[in-house]
Amino acid sequence: MSWDDAIEGVDRDTPGGRMPRAWNVAARLRAANDDISHAHVADGVPTYAELHCLSDFSFLRGASSAEQLFARAQHCGYSALAITDECSLAGIVRGLEASRVTGVRLIVGSEFTLIDGTRFVLLVENAHGYPQVCGLVTTARRAASKGAYRLGRADVEAQFRDVAPGVFALWLPGVQPQAEQGAWLQQVFGERAFLAVELHREQDDGARLQVLQALAQQLGMTAVASGDVHMAQRRERIVQDTLTAIRHTLPLAECGAHLFRNGERHLRTRRALGNIYPDALLQAAVALAQRCTFDISKISYTYPRELVPEGHTPTSYLRQLTEAGIRKRWPGGITAKVREDIEKELALIALKKYEAFFLTVQDVVRFAREQNILCQGRGSSANSAVCYALGITAVNPDETRLLMARFLSEKRDEPPDIDVDFEHERREEVLQYVYRKYGRERAALAATVICYRGKSAVRDVAKAFGLPPDQIALLANCYGWGNGETPMEQRIEEAGFDLANPLINKILLVTEHLRDHPRHLSQHVGGFVISDEPLSLLVPVENAAMADRTIIQWDKDDLETMKLLKVDCLALGMLTCIRKTLDLVRGHRGRDYSIATLPGEDLPTYKMIQRADTVGVFQIESRAQMAMLPRLKPAEFYDLVIEVAIVRPGPIQGDMVHPYLRRRQGREDVSYPSPAVEDILKPTLGVPLFQEQVMELLMHAADYTESEADNLRRSMAAWRRGGDMEQHRTRVRERMQGKGYASTFIDQIFEQIKGFGSYGFPQSHAASFAKLVYASCWLKRHEPAAFACGLLNAQPMGFYSASQIVQDARRGSPERERVEVLPVDVVHSDWDNTLVGGRPWRSAADPGEQPAIRLGMRQVAGLSDVVAQRIVAARTQRAFADIGDLCLRAALDEKARLALAEAGALQGMVGNRNAARWAMAGVEARRPLLPGSPEERPVAFEAPHAGEEILADYRSVGLSLRQHPMALLRPQMRQRRILGLRDLQGRPHGSGVHVAGLVTQRQRPATAKGTIFVTLEDEHGMINVIVWSHLALRRRRALLESRLLAVRGRWERVDGVEHLIAGDLHDLSDLLGDMQLPSRDFH
């Protein structure tokens, strides 16, 4: 086998393996076909339809994708192919897509094994049978934990009792057929029960054929040929064997009877089948396949209608709510342009019959607002004037240029996408509201298909092949360190593996085949599917891993193909942070704000942003965004919209970023490729940055319709992978050149479309996010204590650890006040971090004094909120007399006592950590002293030295309010001639420097071609270090494993952006001893 042999139809360019799937099936099929040994289909060979075939959605059983299976079936001349995954219809939509391209008819089915061992396949005959199979799968899956199923004969009998006939049952007799099983199946399904004869070129095939034919005659069942197919081609047996070993958690050498005896469970040529099966069995299979006429693409779906009150239609009620929203959003009346947009959109919604969908989203948002849960719509829905009127989105149509086609189009044969973000800590309340509103029969989350990636695949494969754990780890690290500049073979050899070793070669080949191979189903981050009828009539429903949640077996791409609407209820940590911050500002500072009422266009806020003083704020907190801020210098809200969108693959790949910056800085004249597109490009100085701009350019400059422009944008990534991109480039070029546009501009536009096909922001989405960017920045600038406190209380979220947040708040900046932070103390601390002291805000002229932050007990490692609440409740009743009183009234167990002592949280009661440890150790088994015994005097304990205290702080609280660790190490740094970060400020551009700091962050952007960005911190601040890919590979261990990293390199200062270009790296972590420091890596 070669490397190419191992990858049949695997789309390695697709992020997530399947995105976007609906437009690249043909490409994946071509890839599968390219590697198929073309079977000669001669006259005279029998016709055939395969009735029992597992795809890769029979997890860890099926070795081939639907694309590979249908491509093979097409080449072998099959008339039909049944996808019969085990107790699942999760892969059936992929089968539908592959069927459409190949012309091989899809038969819908599923395989089942009952708890008594009876095995059979159900094949859907017609529209009556499909919901019956869905219902049986649902029953089985809901009766077991996630990933399993449980089904008994009584369940099957109940499902098919007194229903219209619509399925065929195919009995799978097994190695030792038990006639009683077949008789039972025949009792349930009558003449619709068949016996599957499955022969795989084994020694006893002849005898088995006779036994099964006799058994069929005895039971009065028709026998049909069937393949028990687990792979498209014979050579995939090694993959199937490996999956079997993984499934059974055994090395291949110990799998024994778990493995098939040969590779015959593939889609065999019709000539080969004719040499194995009697013609009658092959003809019976074809005849049965012909009776299965069900077309899954024809299933009907109705959105819930109970939100429409009596006397209204969905259309009239949506109109009523929209008009009410207009009066609220625009109390002074709306412009003619907005009215025109709303009327046009309402008409299109009615035409597409999406009213109930909009009403459902509006209802969910209404519930959240009634519960004081912050929420905001985003994505392309922010192009909707109706969504704004309904209160779903926050982008005012008067303030931005909307392009409705980006959200909703008459020609687009797919539902609109409305994403709504909710506070991440309270999103579950919203999900449970949906479940209560519609019931678990009619509401469920969409699935997400978890696929193997290189690292996870090689771990499982190497383990199956018996590689020792240490070698598995080495091999896996090669995959975790991928970049396009160093071939995989080289990385593996550098790790010490011999590619000529047959064992290593096999491991690598199977690993490549398993890349993007489905591993299991998980739940979508928040995509709800809601139906007017039970969902199990449309798609099987199963239990999720989390309690009180259920998921359907289709993912978001399946839903799009099947035209099922989903409501995305997503979780956003920054909304939690902002809500908690606003509550603190209201309660402690006397300022009652919402996101909408925060003072707009605040100059001090923009000054802070321009300095990249944005640790912890929304979106513009990453190192890449921070590097952009001093160059772009946002000075108004629209600049924030651009800032959010500009550091994305679309503008970057289209080479639009630097021209825009040069024009913004006055280094390049603002010009337009044509007066006809000046209005489109004027907001971005003649440079297209947003998806909507590119679409409008295509419409004006290349005579595309709205739908054509959007289809091109959405489909470009799939076309590129399929190799058909040039014809579309040619079409755009010819049309634009015909209107006088320069070739360089045309190429830029096309490259940007390609980038957007991978990942890019529409302007509407960027504007939605910019609202939160501004809100978080305003709060950080004007209420730094409340913001830092709210951010700590919203953890985990964002790029920065609690330690970095606290360091940033205490450090302050020229634009922002410093904040005092007080330690955790059981005498004063609540569970949450709180504000203490300060003076309330009175006016702009009298802003008061910033309060201090008292760290809460949530920061203490190993302490639960339940214990903390007991401490607070007991303290509220009366002050603690001593440690014994605390432990008694708060019912502290040994774990809680130790956690509080280690965290230094008893400072206010007994003093330093050593004293606290001793005091807590003496709490157990205290007995009354004997009469006359002298009282035991407290023992004075010397405080731990500074290094021990800091070490204990990080270990128990994750941060320290004492000296920064680097301050303690500064004398040793000076001996090594290592500079502090503060020393860099006076260094000219291009200077050679040697610095060191704690590693707080590592990032590897997808567009950076292997470059790693590292953030270092010392007692004076942070810097960004750029590590080129060649150095990253050479100093890999120091880069990935260092807690304290020394860097020699070149200091660069350009346009207010400062960073260090690494020339060499050294790990100095041994100087920290056992100190473990938090680092947010590769988020």
Swiss-Prot record:
Transmembrane segments: none annotated. It catalyses: DNA(n) + a 2'-deoxyribonucleoside 5'-triphosphate = DNA(n+1) + diphosphate. CDD domains: DnaE_OBF, PHP_PolIIIA_DnaE2. Pfam families: DNA_pol3_alpha (PF07733), DNA_pol3_finger (PF17657), HHH_6 (PF14579), PHP (PF02811), tRNA_anti-codon (PF01336). It is found in: Cytoplasm. Its EC number is 2.7.7.7. It comes from the Bacteria. Keywords: Cytoplasm, DNA damage, DNA repair, DNA replication, DNA-directed DNA polymerase, Nucleotidyltransferase, Transferase. Coiled coil: none annotated. GO terms for biological process: DNA repair; DNA replication. One of its GO terms (cellular component) is cytoplasm. The keyword Cell wall biogenesis/degradation does not apply. One of its GO terms (molecular function) is 3'-5' exonuclease activity. Signal peptide: none annotated. Disulfide bonds: none annotated. HAMAP family: DNApol_error_prone. Belongs to the DNA polymerase type-C family. DnaE2 subfamily. DNA polymerase involved in damage-induced mutagenesis and translesion synthesis (TLS). It is not the major replicative DNA polymerase. This is Error-prone DNA polymerase. It comes from Xanthomonas oryzae pv. oryzae (strain PXO99A). The gene is dnaE2.
